[in-house]
Structures are given as structure tokens and as C-alpha cells.
């Protein structure tokens, strides 16, 4: 669940006080329903600027989705600017699904794993009469044992836990200071280790090439 603004305003050009009010009132309304903190956000009209980003931080928002399709599977460097892979009506969605599910090499200098992020609105399925399109997509990507089907919040929490890992100077051990387990694979191998919260583990040895 994510806030979307109290009145779905485009906040670009607004002063920070009005931005904070728009964000916090949306958070409060959702938290009364959900019964727990809501720290996610989706930009109304996909619009934001530096003032909006500062307002999100001041309002306790930890991640925010844009509408800028990347057609890539990169994990965001900044979670307040989380660009999705594509919209659910994107012409390339099935091509992207096949690429995501393939075992082919995916080159990226900024992400250690592939993340397929599809965004959209539920009302669009009725508006465009394309429920079948979405059902075909879900049928293609569902049920894969090597895919983690997660919420935005779960992904951000896990990635931040990975980024907080503390490695020894010789690169042989790793300490997990977070509250959730983290899984680390070796280079060019399917082996992995589990690093439990508050624990230190030995890293996998490099394989001979």
C-alpha cells in the first residue's frame, strides 16, 4: 500500500509545506485503514522535483514510484526515484517477461539481481477491456521457483538490508546488522549462503575459471 497524495495533486511547483500536507494527510488516511505505518508513495501524474523529494523525506516516505518505463530490470539506486520496468499495457511486456525469466546473461553495473516492476491502475482493465491481457501476463510469470514475488516495501527492505552488510577487510566474512536474513550467492555459481540477523558468516570462495 502506498500514499498517492490527499487530492492527487501535481506537487511540482508547490512549496514544501503544502507538499508535506498533501503527503501526510494521504498517509494518515491509509494508516487508519491499514493499522500500520505506510511509507510508500506513488507520484500523482508521475511528477516530482527537488522540493517534492525533500517533502517525501520529511514526511517519512522511504520509497516512491515514478511512471518512467525503463524496459530494464535494475534495482533503483535511490528508492525515492523508483522507475518501473513498464506499464501493464506496454507493447513489450511479454518480450520483457521472456527476457526476465530467461537464464541468459543480464549485464548491469548497478544491480546484482534482476527486478521486473510492472505498474498500472486496476480501473484501466475495465476501461480498456483488457483483463485477458493481464491474465496472460500473470500466467506467464507465475509459479517460478526461482522468482521472488514481493511488494515494493519488501523489496526496499531487503535491498537496504543488503546495502547495510559489513564485510571484513580481507573479503572473507560478512556481518548482517539488519533484522532480516540476507542471501548471498557466489560468482558464476548457483550456491549461496544465508546470513541471519546479527550473525557473521564466511563468504563463498571464488570458483576456478
Which sequence ranges carry the predicted segments?
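Metal-dependent polysaccharide deacetylase catalytic core of the NodB/CE4 family, i.e.
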Residues: 1-52, 57-62, 68-86, 113-122
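A polyampholytic, Gly/Pro-enriched intrinsically disordered region
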Residues: 85-95, 167-174
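A short, acidic, amphipathic alpha-helical segment used as a generic capping/interface helix at domain edges
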Residues: 94-109
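Non-membrane alpha-helical structural segments and their capping/turn regions in soluble enzymes
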Residues: 16-21, 91-94, 98, 131
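Generic C-terminus detector
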Residues: 207-209
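Loop/helix-junction capping segments adjacent to catalytic residues or to phosphate/diphosphate-binding pockets
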Residues: 13, 50, 91, 127-128
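C-terminal domain-boundary segment and adjacent tail
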Residues: 31, 63-72, 110-111, 117-204
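Surface-exposed alpha-helical segments enriched in charged/polar residues
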Residues: 24, 28, 102-106, 139, ...
Amino acid at each position: 500500500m502506498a500514499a498517492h497524495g490527499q487530492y492527487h495533486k501535481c506537487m511540482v511547483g508547490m512549496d514544501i509545506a503544502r507538499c508535506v500536507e498533501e503527503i501526510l494527510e494521504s498517509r494518515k488516511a491509509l494508516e487508519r485503514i491499514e493499522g500500520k505505518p505506510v511509507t510508500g508513495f506513488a507520484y500523482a501524474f508521475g511528477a516530482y522535483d527537488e522540493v517534492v523529494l525533500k517533502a517525501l523525506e520529511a514526511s517519512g516516505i522511504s520509497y516512491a514510484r515514478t511512471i518512467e518505463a525503463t524496459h530494464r530490470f535494475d534495482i533503483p539506486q535511490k528508492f525515492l526515484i523508483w522507475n518501473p520496468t513498464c506499464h501493464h499495457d506496454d507493447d513489450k511486456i511479454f518480450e520483457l517477461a521472456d527476457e526476465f525469466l530467461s537464464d541468459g546473461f543480464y549485464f548491469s553495473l548497478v544491480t546484482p539481481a534482476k527486478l521486473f516492476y510492472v505498474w498500472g491502475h486496476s480501473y484501466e482493465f475495465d476501461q480498456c477491456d483488457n483483463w485477458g491481457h493481464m491474465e496472460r501476463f500473470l500466467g506467464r510469470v507465475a509459479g517460478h521457483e526461482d522468482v521472488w514475488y514481493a511488494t515494493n516495501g519488501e523489496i526496499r527492505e531487503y535491498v537496504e538490508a543488503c546495502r547495510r552488510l559489513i564485510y571484513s577487510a580481507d573479503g572473507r566474512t560478512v556481518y548482517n546488522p539488519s533484522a532480516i536474513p540476507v542471501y548471498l550467492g557466489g560468482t558464476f555459481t548457483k550456491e549461496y549462503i544465508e546470513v541471519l540477523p546479527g550473525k557473521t558468516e564466511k563468504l563463498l570462495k571464488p570458483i576456478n575459471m
